[in-house]
Amino acid sequence: MQNIDLISEEEAQKLLEELADKIAAYNHAYYIEDNPLVSDSEYDQLFNTNLKLEQKFPHLILENSPSKKVGAKIANKFAKVTHQVPMLSLSNAFDEQDVRDFVDRIKIFLRLNEFAPIFCEPKIDGVSFSAVYKHGVLTTGATRGDGYVGEDITANIKTIKNFPHKIDNVPEFLEVRGEIYIEKQDFLNLNKEQEEQGKDKFANPRNAAAGSLRQLDSSITAKRPLKYFVYSGGVTEQNLASSQDQLLTKLKECGFNINEISKLASSEEEIFAFYEYLKTNRENLPYEIDGVVYKLNDFALQNRMGFIARNPRFATAHKFPAIIGQTKLLSITVQVGRTGTLTPVAELEPIEIGGVTVSRATLHNFQEIARKDLRIKDYVFLQRAGDVIPKIMGVDFDKRPNDTETFDTPLFCLSCNSKLHYTPEDIIIRCDNGLNCPAQNYERIRHFVSKNAMDIEGLGRKQVEFLIDKGLISNPLDIFFLKEKNDSSLAKLENMDGWGKKSVENLFKNIEKSKNVSLPRFIYALGIRHIGEQNAKLLAREFGSYNNFIAQMELLRTNEPDIYQKLNNLEGIGDKILVDIIDFFDVKENIELIKKLGEILNIEDYKETREQSSLTDKIVVFTGSLPTISRAEAKATAEKLGAKVAVGVSSNTDLVVAGVDAGSKLKKAKELNIKIIDEEEWLTLIKNV
């Protein structure tokens, strides 16, 4: 990853785009597919890089920024449930200084002179849920989903042992939130059953819990050893108690399971002592935890702190360091991705780390192999932070055998045997054979049908591989003629292994449904290198319609200077990305494929809708000392209402809020005839927005 302090604005723009796409994909895999692609530590590193870039270049923050979102868009097979209060994720603290900063932010934000009591509890590595009771009867159970809309899993939650279906002496409307999990020993037993039945084993306890909850048949869920803890009252918690410790006492009285391992800390020292206690004893707990959650105990103070886009300000998660293990590197295999990028993968002697068996680890790029001096048959150190794919930290050189083998970086593609192209600035090796490379073609079709592209349900990895192997499809266009081909064939798809009449009917129905697609989704589905969802939206906004888009791309092939300049001027499309677009449309087969797709698809023109309020997009400046609220609280409220808070006054400023001892900014605002109000007027204004 590049040094944030030295990065240029253009480089930052490109990196933010890449991070948005990567993190969105990782979120979808984690929250929706229950199949994490990277470790917690690697995800956190990417997310923190994104935050640092946004702090340095706030004007480059994307509409689809990971810092604005929680989780991932929900799938279609469950009914949707809208959370009255969003189920947001927590910010992370990785060391004691991060925790001290968290405590200091609370003091500064709330203008406190003393330490405000902090409630500490284990961070269970499970699946978040919400349960709603009306007149004491359980009516709705839901997953977190994207934080705003989850999936209805009421029938499945009711199968969990000791989960109350009816409770007494509670308000007419009650919500509880918590974590559903599977204990370590139960997980091992479950995987043993899966293996005996010839089924795939679960990667870890969290995946097993998530997969169990997302069963359409609740009788399957009932057979899984699910357990739960509640830790929040959601929209109704402040009707039950005035603090977190009181709330848990009340929920326990109602019959809910709460985690008895908790601590109400009255100092930083008590916080750190509890953290060390849990870190030392985590392996002795029956369930997996990956850190400690700290939250302001007082609900009134929580209300004042409020939220940022995806996190509450009043809480944070102090993560445990990753678990380290050692095993043998058996071999290095190479995967070819959608855009031709080759990625080395370490094949390992299976090792159990934190209750999970690990046999593979990504090596990211070929330079990492050389930098770490990795050799086949070496003993390597693995780092795992609660997920599936660990990271190789280095080699145990003291145990290096005499017969180790160095890995030779390939010169030719392992899929199509074409000569590989090496780009030092990207630290990658790429196959430029495009659709003629079977591996790239497979990944391109997988991308085309994926959730955020054409969204063709029923065409997963195995199904795409099967259809390609049988010669039924060879490019994205073939998908839309699959039914026609099947109808005229003697060898029907529904009679083949892994298929049935119902699954084939559903597939054809979903293919037909996908023919109505928005222009941004269509452009994203094409799989142009570095054109993620955000850049696809930029192009769609610029060209408006499919016909204009394809016409302009054909002009680009003729080196038309106007279209080149138009693209180059787009915010978010730098020189490097422009080269990728040109390279894609320089391939005649790509243009022909897109035209044929355009003939059979209904590609909707681009439309942009935004909710408006009186402060949306207004530029507000705060100056001087505000009598009753902190500057941070005022800024947070303004941003929550859609305003942009600037540090300096200019002709673009819409409003200046002036406190005591306002200086040069107030003077400049008067000179520019900008509207000026005091704190009292500001509080009245935001109350009426």
From Swiss-Prot:
Entry EC number(s): 6.5.1.2
InterPro entries to which the protein is assigned, alphabetical = BRCT_dom, BRCT_dom_sf, DisA/LigA_HHH, DNA_ligase, DNA_ligase_AS, DNA_ligase_CS, DNAligase_adenylation, DNAligase_N
Q: Which cofactor does it need?
A: Mg(2+); Mn(2+)
- Which UniProt keyword terms apply here? DNA damage, DNA repair, DNA replication, Ligase, Magnesium, Manganese, Metal-binding, NAD, Zinc
Binding annotation for Zn(2+): C413, C416, C431, C437
**What GO annotations for molecular function exist for this entry?**
DNA ligase (NAD+) activity; metal ion binding
Q: Give the active-site positions.
A: K123 (n6-amp-lysine intermediate)
A GO cellular component annotation here is: cytosol
Q: Which reaction does it catalyse?
A: NAD(+) + (deoxyribonucleotide)n-3'-hydroxyl + 5'-phospho-(deoxyribonucleotide)m = (deoxyribonucleotide)n+m + AMP + beta-nicotinamide D-nucleotide
Task: Show the HAMAP family listed in the entry.
Answer: DNA_ligase_A
Q: Which family does it belong to?
A: Belongs to the NAD-dependent DNA ligase family. LigA subfamily.
**Functional summary from the UniProt entry:** DNA ligase that catalyzes the formation of phosphodiester linkages between 5'-phosphoryl and 3'-hydroxyl groups in double-stranded DNA using NAD as a coenzyme and as the energy source for the reaction. It is essential for DNA replication and repair of damaged DNA.
**PANTHER family membership:** CHROMOSOME TRANSMISSION FIDELITY FACTOR 18, DNA LIGASE
**What is this protein's name?**
DNA ligase
Which source organism? Rickettsia rickettsii (strain Sheila Smith)
Q: Which gene encodes it?
A: ligA
